[in-house]
């Protein structure tokens, strides 16, 4: 993966640009790095500014995104959490939304920021940008997808049923993309995504918890409760949503 970030991400830009020009929708996730490594010493802010225009669905974790765009802020988050899970101490309005704002200014179209146990933050660009998604999505869908913002809380999983977090983020995004390909609207896609992530954490590996989207929907329809997130600062956000 080293070739994807050296030289200002030149190889990654070349690859994404080529795929984008083929009219294919592109989804990109990120990976965490140690600050002292070669990857950690790259100018990720400039790299993302260069590659974002060629990405249709950008789906990083909030920690990955912050360490790339706002290193000092990332350090402050860790001090705030005192060694606990950072995502349990974040404020959407103050911590998460500004990162999405930055991505939109770089030309992002659809943003999903994985926020750990609390859930996922969803944000989209205006209609002009949404219409640029590879493969074309049409005027009607573009209208319903443009200028959207939401925080989708995780589904409740009892503590004694949590086995491992392995693959939870990846399966969440896979379910979201699969739901879109199946013709679901963004709201239903978010429900299916968070539900799939919740199923994943109930197994020790990344794949055993995966079930067909139709079966995931049945669990949701049966009244699966959402996680109660008292510590996650949603009040200001929800007032503006």
List each language-model region with its residue ranges:
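Short glycine/serine/threonine-biased micro-segments
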Residues: 114-117, 165-167, 195
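Alpha-helix N-cap and coil->helix boundary residues
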Residues: 188-192, 208-211
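An active-site-proximal "capping" alpha-helix that borders the catalytic cofactor pocket
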Residues: 191-200
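Ribokinase/PfkB-type carbohydrate-kinase core domain
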Residues: 1-160, 207, 211-223, 227-241
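Short, small-residue alpha-helix embedded
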Residues: 67, 162-185, 190
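Hydrophobic residues in alpha-helical segments
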Residues: 69, 180-181, 200-201, 220
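Short arginine-rich
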Residues: 199-208
């Amino acid at each position: 993966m080293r070739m994807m970030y050296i030289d200002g991400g030149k190889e990654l830009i070349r690859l994404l640009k080529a795929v984008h020009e083929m009219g294919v929708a592109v989804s990109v996730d990120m990976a965490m790095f140690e600050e002292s490594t070669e990857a950690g010493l790259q100018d990720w802010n400039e790299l993302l500014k260069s590659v974002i225009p060629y990405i249709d669905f950008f789906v990083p974790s909030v920690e990955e995104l912050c360490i790339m765009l706002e290193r000092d802020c990332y350090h402050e988050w860790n001090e705030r959490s005192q060694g606990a899970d950072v995502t349990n101490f974040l404020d959407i309005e103050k911590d998460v939304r500004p990162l999405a704002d930055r991505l939109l200014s770089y030309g992002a179209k659809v943003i999903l920021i994985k926020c750990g146990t609390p859930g996922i933050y969803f944000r989209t660009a205006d209609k002009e940008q949404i219409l640029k998604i590879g493969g074309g999505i049409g005027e009607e869908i573009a209208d319903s997808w443009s200028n959207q913002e939401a925080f989708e809380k995780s589904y409740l999983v009892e503590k004694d049923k949590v086995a491992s977090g392995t693959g939870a983020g990846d399966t969440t995004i896979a379910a979201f993309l699969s739901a879109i390909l199946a013709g679901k609207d963004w709201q239903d896609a978010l429900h299916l995504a968070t539900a799939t992530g919740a199923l994943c954490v109930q197994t020790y590996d990344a794949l055993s918890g995966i079930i067909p989207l139709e079966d995931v929907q049945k669990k949701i329809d049966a009244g699966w409760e959402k996680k109660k997130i008292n510590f996650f600062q949603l009040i200001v956000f929800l007032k503006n949503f």
